[in-house]
Amino acid sequence: MPVLHNRISNETLKERMLAETEPRITISFYKYFSIAEPQETRDALYKAFESLNVFGRVYLAHEGINAQISVPESKVSAFRDFLYSFDPALNNVRLNIALDDDGKSFWVLRMKVRERIVADGIDDPTFNASDVGEYLKAAEVNAMLDDPDAVFIDMRNHYEYEVGHFENALEIPADTFREQLPKAVEMMQEHKDKKIIMYCTGGIRCEKASAWMKHSGFNKVWHIEGGIIEYARRAREQGLPVRFIGKNFVFDERMGERISEDIIAHCHQCGTPCDTHTNCKNDGCHLLFIQCPTCAEKFRGCCSELCSEESVLPEEEQRRRRAGRENGNKIFNKSRGRLNTKLGIPDPE
């Protein structure tokens, strides 16, 4: 029986990817549809994706599929043909092509079965996830941005909103999508008669959020088709003004796509304008934060003097210090509370 998961070290796989000469295309897609046997579907997809040398991260659940992947340029057509024919529900599913892509977004294929493709925390048997808001295309988005009766809601996390968002969009302050849903309903009560436009990176979160808002009694609900990625692509193709300001955070090695030249965030250590996310180089931390080149050199890529000092200790001493620490202090921690606690973020100058 073939091995349906990776057994090679991350370091080796990354070296192989960096040594490749063929360009790669970063693609994301999702689809809410019923999958009777997620594990069987996962195994069949894994075999096919691996045969096409696809890297990336794919989640499957009874409710559908969510994927961010990297495909060799010469295999994109074959990948599209396979995906569209794999299940009738996936025929002509929208493929979001990355805007700012060096082809180095992923170096391993990880495919997992989960309870949900988006962790929403919804436990309401009457909720109909298919009763979504209306789609908005790029020109319609721009028109809504000029409509005084419209309210744009950003359904992404605080660290995503911080580096880029639509003009005057509201942030729902929360660390996770599941926390945002009830807060969005609460915050929008005073705007119940307004037009509510929801958006996210590629569409998967705002689509479900639009259904939740309708379920919660809001009648005028829209969401941006294909999210920020599709909006920016279509606006550029059609010669429309791109009204998204800053950078679009993405969940891969790139950590962001440049949409406009505006730098709206600041280094979390010195306050200088900067929108470059990084993970603290201390293996006992890995906090996600924004760091300018000067501070990166000063702190050795770490989030604090303490982490900088710890990162150069002998490996055995580092392991001893890490022992017993909470898992919440480990890889890719993005909590706003932890960010503020560790860094004491300065006011922008």
Curated annotation (Swiss-Prot):
Region annotated Disordered, chain positions: 316-349
CDD domains registered for this protein in UniProt: RHOD_YceA (cd01518)
Residue ranges, compositional bias (Basic and acidic residues): 316-328
The EC number(s) this enzyme carries: 1.14.-.-
Record keywords: Oxidoreductase, tRNA processing
Reactions listed under catalytic activity: uridine(34) in tRNA + AH2 + O2 = 5-hydroxyuridine(34) in tRNA + A + H2O
Single GO term (MF): oxidoreductase activity, acting on paired donors, with incorporation or reduction of molecular oxygen
GO-annotated biological processes: tRNA modification
PANTHER family according to UniProt: TRNA URIDINE(34) HYDROXYLASE (PTHR43846:SF1), UPF0176 PROTEIN YCEA (PTHR43846)
Protein name, per record: tRNA uridine(34) hydroxylase
